[in-house]
Amino acid sequence: MSRYTGPSWKQARRLGLSLTGTGKELARRNYVPGQHGPNNRSKLSEYGLQLAEKQKLRFTYGVGEKQFRNLFVQATKIKGGILGFNFMLLLERRLDNVVYRLGLATTRRQARQFVNHGHILVDGKRVDIPSYRVTPGQVISVREKSLKVPAILEAVEATLGRPAFVSFDAEKLEGSLTRLPERDEINPEINEALVVEFYNKML
């Protein structure tokens, strides 16, 4: 299954979850899209609940199904901790996600574009792979030639607050993942146990 590239608002309404972090997609119509509107929500089976939760997490980070599944397999090989949370930490450490958390982009999709276009440096070296795994302490910055890209400057200006697990210097347009987040600091609306149950049946 390839990465979803359609309207984020439609996918957000289908999942009942804001994918941009702004909540704007659900502000006016917080029901699934389609002809029957708010009367179209049906009771999901156990499998349906697990699938829906997996999709919520996958679309939140904007990761394709194959890559998402492979990341889960990697999480199963991590010793210690809780599998579901370990999986979420791997998603959090993606470069595109860290760029988003730092406020260098307004959405993860935009952050992925910035990385793909070569605007982002890791420890002074250009990295154009959105899935690059960031290690706490690495410095994420904007390439010198990209310091005046309007979309980046607008994103920084629009960011009102940042998570406690990142640090950011607005003048230098650089920051870092200072530590791994705690569970209550990320995606409280996600029940990762259902995602684990889904993949335990599939793998």
Curated annotation (Swiss-Prot):
Signal peptide: none annotated. PROSITE patterns: RIBOSOMAL_S4, S4. It comes from the Bacteria. SMART domains: Ribosomal_S4, S4. One of its GO terms (molecular function) is structural constituent of ribosome. GO terms for cellular component: small ribosomal subunit. SUPFAM superfamilies: Alpha-L RNA-binding motif (SSF55174). Keywords: Ribonucleoprotein, Ribosomal protein, RNA-binding, rRNA-binding. It holds the Pfam family S4. InterPro entries: Ribosomal_uS4, Ribosomal_uS4_bac-type, Ribosomal_uS4_CS, Ribosomal_uS4_N, S4_RNA-bd, S4_RNA-bd_sf. GO terms for biological process: ribosomal small subunit biogenesis; translation. Residues 93-156 form the S4 RNA-binding domain. One of the primary rRNA binding proteins, it binds directly to 16S rRNA where it nucleates assembly of the body of the 30S subunit. PANTHER family: 30S 40S RIBOSOMAL PROTEIN, SMALL RIBOSOMAL SUBUNIT PROTEIN US4M. Part of the 30S ribosomal subunit. Contacts protein S5. The interaction surface between S4 and S5 is involved in control of translational fidelity. Belongs to the universal ribosomal protein uS4 family. This is Small ribosomal subunit protein uS4. It comes from Streptococcus pneumoniae serotype 4 (strain ATCC BAA-334 / TIGR4).
